[in-house]
Amino acid sequence: MAIPMANFTKLNREACKASIMIEGLTGKGKSGLALMLAYGLEGGFQEHDDNSDRVNPWEKVFTIDTENRSLNLFIGIPASWGGTFGQFYGTQLTSEDGYAPSNYLYLRDAAIKAGAGVVVSDSVTHMWTAKGGVLDKVNDVKLKNPRMDNYRVWGEPEVAAEKQALIDVIRDHRCHIITTVRVKEKFDMQYNADKQKNEVVSIGEQQLQQEGLKYEPDLVLHMVAPGSGNPQKHPRAKVIKSRYAIFTEGETYEFTPQLCEQLRQYLAEGVSIETLLEQQRQDYIKAVTEILNNNTSAKTIWPVLKEEAGVKNAKLSEINLTVLKQLYSQLIAD
C-alpha cells in the first residue's frame, strides 16, 4: 500500500478551553465565583467599543443546577464587579432524574449543541454521593456480588463506565467547563496537655467527591471568602492546583475583572493540550507512588492490577494516562 504524500505545516499554539473546579464549604461563594468566571471567559470583562455589536456574554453561559435552583437567585442581583448577574440558560437535575455522571454528560452535550460557550455544573458532589451516583452504583454491584473485593468492584463495566463519565464531565475541548464541589470539615480527637483532657479539633477540609477527581481539572480553587455586590467585595480563593502559568499554587487571589480577563486572554493565546495532559499524567504517577509507599495492601495487589490492565511489565513512568486513571481508581477503592 502506497503511503500518501505527507503535507507538513507549521504548527501554532491553539486556544484552550478552561477546566476549572471550585471547592468550598456551603455559603463560601462557589456558585458566585463560577458565574463570574463563566462571564469573564466569554469576554464579559473585555474592553469593547460602546458601539460594537457583540453577543451578550450571558447568552453563552449554560448551567446544570443540582442545588434546588440556587443559581436562579443570582439573576439580577448586584455583582462584585459593579454590574449585575445577567440572565443565563440553565436546567435542573433532581433526585428523580438520578445523579449518574452519564446524566451530567447528556445535559452538557445538550448545552453545547444549544450554543454554550461555558457549562457550569453546580455541584458535581451529587454524582459521587447522591442517588444514582457512582457510590450508589458501587453498592448495587456489591449487593449482587457480596464476595467481590473492592478492587474488582471498581473494575466492573457498569461501575467503570460511570467512573469514566465522572471524569469526562470535568473537561471538554468544545467549551469551557466549570464545576463546583462541596467540602466537609474533618475533625479528630487530640489530647490537650494544658487542660489534661481530649478535645475535638478541626484538622482541615475534604472534598465530598472521589479523591482522584482533583487531578482532572487544570485549575482547582478553594474558596476563602465570597464576593458581594453590596458592599462591593471581590471573591477570594486559594489556588490548590494549577496548570496555568498565570497562577501560583498555594497563593490566595482576589478574583477581580482584571484577573478574569487575564485568564481569558491566557487561554485564548493557546496552551498545548499535550502539555496539560502530560502534567496530569505526572500528577497521577505521584499519587500512585504515594499510595504504594504507604499502603501495604495496595502494594500487594498492584502487580495483579497491572497484569489485568495489560501493563504487567511496564514501569509506572511508562503507563499511559488512561490506564493510570483506571489503576488509581482501583487502588483507592479499598
Question: How does the language model describe each region?
Answer:
Residues 27, 160, 167-258:
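Phosphate-binding/switch region of NTP-binding enzymes
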Residues 43-44:
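Extreme N-terminal leader/anchor segments
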Residues 17-21, 60, 117-120, 176-178:
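Residue-level preference for the first positions of well-ordered beta-strands
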Residues 39, 112-113, 171:
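Residue-level signal for alpha-helix termini/capping positions
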Residues 1-24, 28-35, 39, 48-56, ...:
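Interfaces that engage single-stranded nucleic acids at replication/repair/recombination sites
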Residues 25, 56-157, 161:
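Conserved inter-motif catalytic segment of the P-loop NTP-binding fold
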Residues 14, 29-30, 99-103, 158-162, ...:
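Short, glycine/acidic-rich beta->alpha junctions
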